[in-house]
Amino acid sequence: METYVLSDRRLASVEAWQEAIDLAGLPLRMSQATPFSELQGALPVVLERRPTAFECDHCDAKELMAELSEVAFDRPWTFALAFRWGADVYAGASAYAAAAAYALATDGVILDCEEAKLISPERAIEISRELAQSEALIHEAVRRVMELYQNKSQP
C-alpha cells in the first residue's frame, strides 16, 4: 500500500520532521540514522512503543501527477514523498501518521492511493489511529478464541 505527500517545500531534516510529529501529538518516533535528503527504502520507526518500519522515498512530483491523471490535483506540486508498507498494520499506521505530520509541516497535501484521492492531514491521522486500534482488536479476538479453545479442550 502507498500514500504520497505533495508539497512545494521539503523539511531540512528528519529532526524537523520529528518536531512536526511531536507538535501534532502523534505517538511516533522516527530513526534519525539516515539524513532526510538520502531517505530511500525502509525507515525504522516506533509507534506506541512498537518497532516497525515503512518505506520512504523522494519522488518526482510532476511524473507522479502525470501517471495519476484520474486524481483531481488542485494544482501542480514541486515535491513528492512516497510512503509504502505491506501487511504490518503498525507500519501502515506509522506511515499515515508520518505523512500527516509531514503534510502539516510543509503545507502539503496527502494522496491516499487506497481511496485514489487527496485527503487532509486530519483524515490521515484518523486512518492511522483506526489502523493501530484494529491491530489491538485483532489480537483481542485471537486471545478470546484461544481461551475458548483451551477451556473446551480441558476436562
Describe the function of each predicted region.
Residues 1-155:
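Acidic (Asp/Glu-rich) sequence patches and key acidic residues
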